[in-house]
Design a protein with these regions (language model features):
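Hydrophobic alpha-helical transmembrane segments of integral membrane proteins
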Residues: 61-62, 130-131, 187, 207
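Lipid-exposed faces of alpha-helical membrane segments in multi-pass integral membrane proteins
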Residues: 2, 32, 69-76, 99-102, ...
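Membrane-interface helix-loop-helix regions
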Residues: 52-53, 57, 63-125, 156-181, ...
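His/acidic/aromatic-lined binding-pocket segments of jelly-roll/cupin-type domains
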Residues: 28-31, 186
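Alpha-helical transmembrane segments in multi-pass integral membrane proteins
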Residues: 2-23, 39-52, 109-111, 136-143, ...
Length: 343
């Protein structure tokens, strides 16, 4: 959020965005965490096509409603710009991207530029990971953790070859966005490997200090711009150590429960912040407040940050769950409950 907001800053923007850009591998950590949780939760449950269909439907129901809502907001902006004849707004490019966004395939290489709901390439990438999840299931049931490791290494090797052949517009798979689905699945596979490590409990880690130390090392490596593979390895080791400590002592993070109202809407914060950026910074700040010089940017930007958080919490409560339930359909009954009903 701060990274994108800084582009509107009248001073400090170049230094601030350059510094925060170094932390972008944290997005890879998000996909690793997702791979870990999905594998832990569903790795033993998907046994046939019906299970997979239900899984995919429920996961899409979690992401798709808010993605569509935000996308349609920017479609409306593009239509208004077209009607107003705003030549400074790329409305034609935005409207051309609409079908790709609504189909959530804009991170699969169907376009070479970000448009409309630009941060939602990660939503497209996450849905791709869900669709490809059977590959992880097959590898896991074939050879367990070694099978997951082979899948991960094979996928990364293929991405590295594609990078050498110039397939990725960004130059390398680790910085891909319009083809970010393939990058995300590599991280997702790493998360699945972490799930395998934690399930085996090969190491008895009970303190969160090793995980925090490894995370600090990963952040330092990002800031110092050390090799990306080192950063990814440190992130993976950090998540592994943290997950081992958390599963060994489930109550060890009880003190952090106060932050749950915010952390549970992190997805909403991520998707809503471009809307707040447009309303508060592109419109209110750029058109009126900056020319008037009545408030400092770094005071004003607290308002769109607070608005993003508030809207994300309201959206989670009143929009996402209701629309998501329409897509997900009724939850499957437990097997024992189904047997009782049929008796």
């Amino acid at each position: 959020m701060a990274y994108h907001f800084l582009f509107a800053a009248p001073y400090g923007a170049e230094a601030g965005t350059e510094f925060l850009h170094r932390l972008l591998p944290l997005l890879d950590m998000f996909f690793m965490i997702s791979g870990f949780f999905i594998t832990t939760r569903y790795g033993g449950e998907l046994r046939d096509v019906a299970d997979y269909r239900g899984f995919l439907r429920r996961r899409i129901a979690r992401l798709y409603p808010l993605h569509v809502i935000v996308t349609l907001f920017f479609v409306a902006v593009a239509l208004l710009a077209m009607i107003a004849g705003a030549d400074n707004y790329p409305w034609r490019q935005e409207l051309e991207a609409m079908p790709l966004h609504l189909l959530a395939i804009h991170a699969l290489g169907t376009t070479d530029h970000l448009a409309l709901n630009f941060v939602s390439w990660s939503v497209s990438a996450e849905i791709f990971c869900y669709a490809a999840f059977p590959l992880i299931i097959v590898a896991m049931r074939w050879k367990g953790l070694p099978g997951l490791g082979l899948l991960t290494l094979g996928w990364i090797a293929a991405l590295e070859m594609a990078s050498q052949w110039g397939v990725f517009p960004s130059g390398h798979w680790t910085t891909a966005d319009t083809m970010g689905a393939y990058r995300a699945f590599a991280d997702f596979c790493i998360g699945a490997c972490i799930a395998g490590v934690v399930a085996r409990r090969a190491l008895d880690i009970r303190s969160h200090l090793p995980g925090l130390a490894l995370l600090a090392g990963a952040l330092a490596a990002m800031i110092w711009q050390l090799p990306t593979y080192l950063v990814l390895a440190l992130l993976a080791f950090s998540l592994s150590a943290t997950a081992l400590a958390e599963t060994a002592r489930p109550n060890s993070t009880a003190a952090l429960r106060f932050a749950m109202p915010v952390t549970r809407v992190s997805f909403g914060i991520y998707l809503w912040h471009p809307v707040m950026e447009f309303l508060f910074l592109t419109v209110i700040w750029t058109r009126w407040l900056e020319p008037a010089g009545i408030v400092d940017f770094y005071v004003f930007w607290l308002l769109p940050m607070a608005a993003t958080l508030a809207v994300a919490m309201l959206s989670d409560r009143y929009l996402e769950k209701r629309f998501g339930a329409l897509i997900a359909g009724p939850r499957p009954r437990p097997a024992c409950e189904a047997r009782l009903a049929s008796a």
